[in-house]
């Protein structure tokens, strides 16, 4: 055993305890157990005072009452995490707690839970559709999140008419959009969006071409400067 251990105060915090005072650890632990065992049900942390919680929440749990041996092994585990015996004891204690919770929750009906999602997580019972719909209404779509509509498939004849008109002028008025739409079978809004996208595409291609030309000019100027420098040296 190491030269120092840890003890637990009433607040649940760990503080160091010297090896000379190890005999007082069990006395403090027993006092803690008695304090939790005799705690009245009307305490702020007790759920038995709330009528919304079923009887299974009020049943005694091996995880709520502190065990002196368990507290001792927790102290040893916090001080020496490589001890296989201490780790095995802690894992067995966790399995015991899980088995108790599973047994208590399996005996309850879905209507006895204070909240639908508690029953869903405890007994793997799907929540009612009304609850899911209510949860969806509490988180509406943000104004910035715009839903994108489906792309309109254009036929070859429609694209030919649109491109021919765009080559004449990249803008089109409302009256002309209506007339053209009646001929090729498109709405004025669809024609407007197509012209906007076409103008944006051309501007993007033009900017890309200008950037490529600038890079090419810089490269050509650098090559010419290097050639001139070679001629001067020679």
Swiss-Prot record:
Composition skew (Basic and acidic residues), residue ranges: 220-234
Region (Disordered) location: 128-154, 209-234
DNA-binding span(s): 147-206
Cellular location(s): Nucleus
Domain of life: Eukaryota
Name of this protein: Homeobox protein ceh-51
GO cellular component: nucleus
Family: Belongs to the NK-2 homeobox family.
GO molecular function, one term: RNA polymerase II cis-regulatory region sequence-specific DNA binding
Keyword set, alphabetical order: Developmental protein, DNA-binding, Homeobox, Nucleus
UniProt-listed SUPFAM superfamilies: Homeodomain-like
PROSITE patterns attached to this UniProt entry: HOMEOBOX_2
Nucleus keyword on record: yes
InterPro entries associated with the record: Distal-less_Homeobox_TF, HD, Homeodomain-like_sf
Primary location class: nucleus
BP terms from Gene Ontology: cell differentiation; mesodermal cell fate specification; muscle cell fate specification; nematode pharyngeal muscle development; nematode pharynx development; regulation of transcription by RNA polymerase II
Signal peptide feature range: none
Disruption-associated phenotype: RNAi-mediated knockdown on an hlh-1 mutant background causes embryos to become paralyzed and arrested at the 2-fold stage.
């Amino acid at each position: 055993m190491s030269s120092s251990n840890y003890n637990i105060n009433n607040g649940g915090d760990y503080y160091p305890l010297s090896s000379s005072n190890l005999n007082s650890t069990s006395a403090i632990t027993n006092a803690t157990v008695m304090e939790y065992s005799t705690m009245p049900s009307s305490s702020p942390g007790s759920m038995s005072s709330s009528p919304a919680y079923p009887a299974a929440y009020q049943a005694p749990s091996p995880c709520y009452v502190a065990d002196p041996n368990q507290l001792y092994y927790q102290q040893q585990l916090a001080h020496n995490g490589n001890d296989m015996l201490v780790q095995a004891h802690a894992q067995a204690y966790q399995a015991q707690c899980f088995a108790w919770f599973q047994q208590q929750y399996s005996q309850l009906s879905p209507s006895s839970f204070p909240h639908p999602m508690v029953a869903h997580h405890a007994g793997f019972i799907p929540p009612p559709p009304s609850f899911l719909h209510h949860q969806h209404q509490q988180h509406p779509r943000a104004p910035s999140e715009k839903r994108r509509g489906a792309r309109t498939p254009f036929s070859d004849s429609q694209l030919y008419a649109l491109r021919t008109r765009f080559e004449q002028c990249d803008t089109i008025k409302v009256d002309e959009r209506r007339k053209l739409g009646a001929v090729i079978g498109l709405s004025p809004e669809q024609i407007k969006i197509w012209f906007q996208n076409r103008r944006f595409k051309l501007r993007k291609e033009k900017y890309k071409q200008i950037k490529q030309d600038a890079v090419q000019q810089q490269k050509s100027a650098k090559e010419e400067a290097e050639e001139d420098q070679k001629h001067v040296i020679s």
